[in-house]
Amino acid sequence: MAEPTEKRLVSETGVAARVAQIVEGPIEGLGFRLVRVKISNTNGCTVQIMAERPDGTMGVDECETVSRAISPILDLEDPVGGAYYLEISSPGIDRPLVRVSDFERWAGYEAKVELAVPMDGRKRFRGILGVPSADGATVPIDLPDVKPGLPSRIDLPLRDLGEAHLVLTDDLIRESLRRGSAPPQDGEDVDEEAGEAPEDEVPQVRFIPQPKRPKPKMDKKSDKKSDKPVKAKKPKPGGGIVTKAARLKNRDTLH
């Protein structure tokens, strides 16, 4: 069974890495797991923190719990150094794969994997995942349409993992619904045979409580706070919860 403290196979860089270092411990202390931290230019600057329960689920209340816990910490540490939107979200159906348990849970489904270190001159792979090795060192992937004479299944070294995420397919959507994950959002295609999501289905959400303001600037001459107010971006119309469709369209895809 996956544990909250299971280490990730990937890490962020730059500002995202500083945010991850600050929030990972508090998130684990709440019984959740940090998945990824992403910084984007949406609405000026958006800090997106993906989190989940060890079983892979995450609902509105859980997102709000995480947001309330880490917001004061981020305000104190100020890793961004400017105004930004804090967005807490679940990983989504086409989720990133960042732990060995993620690969175990989604064995048999299509994924895109990019290695940080080339393997036989190649870094990017797309195929059906197998079950990781017992020691968690490698994960097999079945490659479609390989050239004659080349192996159709190879073992990818997880120590060299750069990025990985599931590919959004009808089979994946059906299985996500069966496991109690969120239904697809507006703009996502679903096979009609998959059926509609139950009314009590936990929605795939983002929780955006409010824009975060930068710390007041100090007057170098007087060593006093500047009287000039610092403006933060206005929040989106419609409240703090928005759908995930936009993120699916804007996600950096692996080829």
Curated annotation (Swiss-Prot):
Domain of life (superkingdom): Bacteria
Signal peptide feature range: none
Gene3D superfamilies linked to this entry: RimP-like superfamily, N-terminal (3.30.300.70)
Chain positions covered by the region annotation Disordered: 177-255
Basic and acidic residues bias locations: 216-230
Gene Ontology cellular component list: cytosol
Keyword Iron included in the entry's annotation: no
InterPro entries: Ribosome_maturation_RimP (IPR003728), RimP_C (IPR028998), RimP_C_sf (IPR036847), RimP_N (IPR028989), RimP_N_sf (IPR035956)
Cell compartments where the protein resides: Cytoplasm
Database matches in CDD domains: YlxS_C
Acidic residues composition bias: residue spans: 186-202
One Pfam family from the record: DUF150_C
Keywords: Cytoplasm, Ribosome biogenesis
UniProt GO BP: ribosomal small subunit assembly; translation
Purpose: Required for maturation of 30S ribosomal subunits.
Family the UniProt entry places it in: Belongs to the RimP family.
NCBIfam families referenced in this protein's UniProt entry, alphabetically: PRK00092.2-5 (NF000932)
Identification of the protein by name: Ribosome maturation factor RimP
Organism of this sequence: Methylorubrum populi (strain ATCC BAA-705 / NCIMB 13946 / BJ001) (Methylobacterium populi)
